[in-house]
């Protein structure tokens, strides 16, 4: 069994485990094509995967990739001199569309391309149930969420390209709009995740089964909750950790003495929520919304040296049958898989080490960062050719966006 941090470079194994600051932006005038500004709004988990991590990795490679709010003149200044602005899960509301169209026209006059980025299906009526649930967290009514779905799609129609995480999600987008789409798979900042997680020493020495995630439909977690109830009764020495959204059915399934609750940490300490998990659970019901997801939770568990049990939806292709993790789709299957890993330490360690190596080599930054500039270059080049755009004086308008 390897020890946590074995994949870190020597300078990252220092005693204080300080996570380095984001790298300084290069001079936009001298940076290679494409130069990009991520327009952001919220501070949710997707921002790490689809903006902060890849931006930092690319800046270290010499690219100009800035991010911030266009409403903020100071951060928006970093959009000056860029080839494209990427809207990260943002759109114009209905009353803002005329302003948005004027903004798009002005950027096109300057030769700048406008792209949209999303890692979930945020535009399909088929996903309304899950989107209603997520919208309720922000105080939105079902009607307001439905309106936001339509406005988001209207915004995409007006933009020059879309980046998404998977071919499945790309197919969904292509079925709803003619806007060109490029796929950029998710990749974990391996060293960052391990550095940050090491800042949260393990507090509970018991073998710990864990789940981490945001608010979701109960269909995702119901089979797992029943399995946890059975496993907790069979193995009273095992602990169960719920990190992030405190899913009621998971909490109710486990006696208080075996339960560990952990809220989400701020983004700069996000990985600490996973501390102490030995077996990570990734349950997903087979729904249209979930089919567009990626196996990022399993990547995060890999960085924590945890063995993984996951639903076939999304995870079957990544884990394979018993090669990198175990698959389960019913309460009985979840119970069997968890019990195997509790009782067979060698299997648990082998799967964890094998999966960690796989993720580190094939699904991590900086190695996979190059997919971003390749996708941007293709979308920008196609848009400029299609619209007859030329590079002009880089000016940026402010103050007309809402998430």
What are the functions of these language-model segments?
Residues 124, 216-219, 264-303, 309-319:
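Nucleotide-sugar-dependent
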Residues 37-57, 61-63, 186-195, 199-276:
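Conserved catalytic-core segment of nucleotide-activated headgroup transferases in glycan assembly
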Residues 2-92, 128-129:
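N-terminal pre-catalytic "stem/leader" segment of glycosyltransferase-like enzymes
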Residues 157-174, 178-195:
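Donor nucleotide-sugar binding/catalytic pocket of nucleotide-sugar-dependent glycosyltransferases
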Residues 321-332, 340-346:
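Conserved acidic donor-binding segment of nucleotide-sugar-dependent glycosyltransferases
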Residues 116-149, 194-195, 204-205, 383:
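Acceptor-binding helix/loop patch of EC 2.4 sugar-transfer enzymes
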Residues 69, 103-109, 139-161:
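Membrane-proximal helix-turn-helix segments that form the acceptor-binding/catalytic region
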Residues 346-381, 392:
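A charged, aromatic-enriched C-terminal amphipathic alpha-helix characteristic of glycosyltransferases
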């Amino acid at each position: 069994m390897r020890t946590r941090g074995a994949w870190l470079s020597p300078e990252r194994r220092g005693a204080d485990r300080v996570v380095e600051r984001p790298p300084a932006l290069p001079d936009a005038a001298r940076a290679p094509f494409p130069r990009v500004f991520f327009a952001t709004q919220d501070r949710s988990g997707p921002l790490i995967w689809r903006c902060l991590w890849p931006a930092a990795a690319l800046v270290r490679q010499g690219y100009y990739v800035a991010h911030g709010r266009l409403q903020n003149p100071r951060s928006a200044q970093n959009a000056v001199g860029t080839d494209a602005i990427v809207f990260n899960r943002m759109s114009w509301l209905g009353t803002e569309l005329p302003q948005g169209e004027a903004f798009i026209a002005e950027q096109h006059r300057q030769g700048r391309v406008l792209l949209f980025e999303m890692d979930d299906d945020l535009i399909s009526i088929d996903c309304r149930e899950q989107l209603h649930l997520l919208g309720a967290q922000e105080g939105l009514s079902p009607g307001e969420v439905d309106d936001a779905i339509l406005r988001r799609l209207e915004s995409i129609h007006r933009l020059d390209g879309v980046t998404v995480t998977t071919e499945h999600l790309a197919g969904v987008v292509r079925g709803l709009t003619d806007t060109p789409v490029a796929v950029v798979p998710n990749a974990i900042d391996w060293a960052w995740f391990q550095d940050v997680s090491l800042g949260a020493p393990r507090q509970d020495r018991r073998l710990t089964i864990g789940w981490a995630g945001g608010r979701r439909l109960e269909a995702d977690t119901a089979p797992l909750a029943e399995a946890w109830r059975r496993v907790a009764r069979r193995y009273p020495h095992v602990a169960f950790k719920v990190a992030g959204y405190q899913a009621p059915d998971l909490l109710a399934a486990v006696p208080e003495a075996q339960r560990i609750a952990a809220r989400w940490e701020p983004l700069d300490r996000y990985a600490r929520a996973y501390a102490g998990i030995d077996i990570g659970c990734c349950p997903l019901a087979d729904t249209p919304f979930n089919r567009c997801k990626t196996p990022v939770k399993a990547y995060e568990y890999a960085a924590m040296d945890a063995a993984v049990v996951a639903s076939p939806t999304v995870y079957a292709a990544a884990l394979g049958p018993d090669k990198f993790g175990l698959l389960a789709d019913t309460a009985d299957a979840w119970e069997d898989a968890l019990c195997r890993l509790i009782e067979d330490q060698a299997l648990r360690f082998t799967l964890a080490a094998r999966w960690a190596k796989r993720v580190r080599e094939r699904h991590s930054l900086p190695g996979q960062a190059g997919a971003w500039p390749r996708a941007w270059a293709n979308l920008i080049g196609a848009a400029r050719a299609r619209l007859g755009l030329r590079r002009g004086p880089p000016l940026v308008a402010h103050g007309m966006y809402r998430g």
